Amino acid sequence: MTTLADLRINYSRASLDEADAAPDPFVQFDRWFKEALAAKLPEPNTMTVATVGADGRPSARILLIKAVDERGFVFFTNYESRKGHDLAANPHAALLFYWIELERQVRIEGRIEKTSTDESDRYFASRPLGSRIGAWASEQSTVIDSRATLEAREKEVAARYGENPPRPPHWGGYRLVPDAIEFWQGRPSRLHDRLLYTRDDAAATGWSISRLAP
């Protein structure tokens, strides 16, 4: 049997140098994201979202990024879920994008704010009908009796709202406003390239760049 200690690959696809990195981390993220799209990676918009609750316990889950601009990184969820309760108690989070085919990671840390009602309404209206019904049917992160209970609730919601379910008051968007963004490029011998962007009001771009030891 193969042991876990024997599982490894050597990274050699690319490098990341300060001279080639964009001065603005949002520009650098856009560059890498477009390269992930061009490489036809499966769901390059998936990310891990890590939160910490009032009890100090961390939790993490996979979500989809839905918008990125100079204000931050936007995702949508149930405000009454575990992550929602965590963020209400501690409005800070970390995101991680992992594009293994490109041997890249992007780590993002910052404070969390809710998106506007209009932003949440517009995105909710753009979702497939089944997803909009599901937002009402699922009391996310609560214990349920069975799959049948969930499906019965789905049918009930579909009958009530038809083709136009409104956005539930417990569902909407969050924006992570970053204060640190790290770009990681795998390199041979585990001597990876790591460039960390941190907020810096004195810098022309509002960000400073540091190289971290792997």
Swiss-Prot record:
Binds 1 FMN per subunit. One of its GO terms (biological process) is pyridoxine biosynthetic process. It is an enzyme of class 1 (oxidoreductase). Disulfide bonds: none annotated. Keywords: Flavoprotein, FMN, Oxidoreductase, Pyridoxine biosynthesis. Pathway: Cofactor metabolism; pyridoxal 5'-phosphate salvage; pyridoxal 5'-phosphate from pyridoxamine 5'-phosphate: step 1/1; Cofactor metabolism; pyridoxal 5'-phosphate salvage; pyridoxal 5'-phosphate from pyridoxine 5'-phosphate: step 1/1. Its EC number is 1.4.3.5. Signal peptide: none annotated. FMN binds at residues 61-66, 76-77, 82-83, 105, 140-141, 184, 194. The keyword Flavoprotein applies. One of its GO terms (molecular function) is FMN binding. Its cofactor is FMN. Substrate binds at residues 8-11, 66, 123, 127, 131, 190-192. HAMAP family: PdxH. Homodimer. This is Pyridoxine/pyridoxamine 5'-phosphate oxidase.
